[in-house]
Amino acid sequence: MATDWQPECMVSQNQAALESIGAHSDRALQNTSGNVQAYSDSLAHHDTTGRDDPLQHYTLKYPHPPVPVPSHPLPTATANLYHPQLLSHRYQVKKLRRLQSNGSSYAGSRRGRSYLKSQKYLEYRARPRRDTGKDGEPVWSDELEDAFQQALEANPPMGRRKWSERGKSYGRNELIAEYIYKLTGKRRTRKQVSSHLQVLDSFLKGDPDWERLVREQSDRSTAQTQPVGPRWRTSMDHLPSSHYGTHATSSYPEPMRLMPPYSADLQLPQYSPTSTQQDTNNNTIQGLSFDMWVSAPNKPDRIDDAYHLYTRLQGDQRQPPMPLEDLKNWRVSFPHLSSSLSDVNDPLNCEIILLETNLELMDDFPPMGSRLGIHLELDIANPMSGTAPTVNQMENWTCSTYIYEDGRRTMEAYHNLTKPHTTKVKPPFESSWWAKTFTKLTQDKREAESTGHHHAADERTRRYFHSLTAVQEIRATVPPSLRRLQNHYPGSPAEESKRMAIILWKFRQTRPNEVGTTTWRKLITSPDRALTNSPRPSTAIDLPPLSLDSILLSKPTSNLYQAPPQHHDLLHQNAPSQQSWSLYQPSHDHVNSLYHSAGAFDFLNSITKPEEGLSDKTAPTSVLDPFPNLTQQTTSQTAGINVSSGTPVMLQIPDLSLSSNLGTYGLGHESHYVPSHHNAANLHDHSSTTGLGHYFAPSTQSLDEISHSHAPWSAPNTTISGDTSGGNYHHLPFTTSDHSVTVSRESHQNHSFEGLLPSDDLVGIVGGLSGDPNMNGAGPEHTSSAYAEHTAVEAV
């Protein structure tokens, strides 16, 4: 039998790369990579009887199902495969099988469906199937019809509602189409399902069992129950996948075991460790084949005629899926996978396969002219989504191979693959590198044995394979024609290569009397939060409606002027301990007092004034200080705080540049309130400020450092004229254009009440203040001398 060897992968005996190995380089392995016919393909054409080779016990990877034995004699004329009697017999067998699956197989797991035995339905199914699908088979064959009926039971009617799964919405027809595909491996679109439902409904309408499956019950649609969803045991990806090669050979898979009938306590599918959580547009690995052997000279390049067998994946040696985090030191052993998982620009959305290979090494060099053969084949299932391209439609297939030793990359190779005509892809596995490695290991073993260190050489080889790992990444691109159908714009990620699969390799040397075997399993990554269903309670909780009055009463009343935490800490360093002034909680009827008679907002008169003086109270300005945390730092100069011998202390607020676009009022220059369109703090500005808490965070600057970026603080002053006068408030005079007060800092535009309130309201606001000398320089004769110390403001 001719084999499909790649000539460019042949390694000659006198190759320069092998001359440096040693004296036995003339006996180095010649190698070939991949793309040889599987053992099962040649087993059927060659006689295997009488062989003592253990390879004769190979099991076929593509087993044919047993042919049912008919109860009546078959026609003997087999020359014509389309004999009418033979076709009639096949139809009767399929019909009998379908009726059996519809009847006794599900008698105890679902309700009866009387319409399947109705005359109209049987006549419809007896018609010859003329319409065919893209796969060349009838659109609704007996196999697909049975899967369709099962899908109706598994997916109750949902009306116009959608089922949310992995961040996407699915209608009932889409769920039915997906159910059919997972059960049979044959794809039928949502429109085909809808058309088939309409055809069946035309002559089954009125049947109670049919109505139950196609229409929502009135009591269920009006009642406030939980949303109806698929009655599957787990999510859509958790259906049992078909065995390797089942789709190609098995004419009728085992029917699915369904859930009990609908109940209101049905739970939503949730994530489990055995799930894959893959998108419907992604591909899954449904089968794998791997062999590595040495062919003797002048012998066919077949594994059944192998001179030595390093390892083989016999049958479908598939292990249960395992979480990736359970793989010990996977980030160190597979650096490429670790970097791929952390790449946010190219998220990992393909399956990860782990192959654990046990290698049985040779005791001596093979005969001169021997060849190394490696066969690796992946069976990649088509995506579940009807719009995603199939495997044979993908283009530009590539394979990247990375080989590591203790996490250090020792070899890297890239190969272009042949476009597959089916779902099977055959990537190479660097047979040249393996031939060189096996030859070098055999040479080291022979040299160690000649010096009497046999066990040392064996342990060294075992440690080498224990530290050896490999990663293979298979990619492909969507063809331009299908890319346009999917409405992808130029430059979109669809034009880039798509990961089809990632293969991880771990190696081990066999023990004495062991044979080389290979197993594989799928690795499960942690599900993305956007692709995972949120759990919901098993029973719904109906809360009584809340009236508007109850909502308003339950809302806590916010105090307009609320003292910030640690407001009196500013005075502890420069004044004796004083009792804080507890603010009066304004009642609801006090809201009107916040507004002046002219209708303007009154910021200063909103505080309820006590009748007695403030000789033993904290100054109001210190209570309303919006920058209390600036005083946490100690400084050698107490500039900016004017202290009198027996009166509260007044804090002068420095100029702070406020950001713009805050939809409220803030403190600006000269402690004036400014509107939202000018010098207000923005909650989301460029300074990584996410809230007011960040804006008023504890400062790490001292007061001296702040003076370099803001107006300088005045020199300390402890005497104020008239601070021992009467105990009543004095009114501040309103300065007009012809009467000004000397101020030490330069004035800034738009930092006053102009534009915020009319001039008449300004007179009322400022005139509302009393002339109490205890206001620390706020009376008519109290012009603070602190402002006279400096006449310039440092530029910011």
Swiss-Prot record:
SMART domains found in the cross-reference section: TEA (SM00426)
One Gene Ontology biological process: regulation of DNA-templated transcription
Superkingdom of this protein's organism: Eukaryota
GO function terms (MF aspect): DNA-binding transcription factor activity; DNA-binding transcription factor activity, RNA polymerase II-specific; RNA polymerase II cis-regulatory region sequence-specific DNA binding
Family matches, as InterPro entries: TEA/ATTS_dom, TEA/ATTS_sf, TEC1_TEAD_TF
Biased composition (Polar residues): 243-252, 629-643
GO cellular component terms listed in the entry, alphabetical order: nucleus; transcription regulator complex
Transmembrane segments annotated in the record for this chain: none
Keyword list, A-Z: Activator, Conidiation, DNA-binding, Nucleus, Sporulation, Transcription, Transcription regulation
Ranges annotated as DNA-binding: 133-207
Region called Disordered, residue ranges: 215-254, 612-643
Family, similarity comment: Belongs to the TEC1 family.
Role summary: BrlA, abaA and wetA are pivotal regulators of conidiophore development and conidium maturation. They act individually and together to regulate their own expression and that of numerous other sporulation-specific gene. Controls temporal and spatial specificity in Aspergillus development. Directs the differentiation of phialides and is continuously required for maintenance of their function. Expression of abaA leads to activation of brlA and wetA, cessation of vegetative growth, and accentuated cellular vacuolization.
Name this protein carries in UniProt: Conidiophore development regulator abaA
Organism: Emericella nidulans (strain FGSC A4 / ATCC 38163 / CBS 112.46 / NRRL 194 / M139)
Native organism taxonomy: Eukaryota, Fungi, Dikarya, Ascomycota, Pezizomycotina
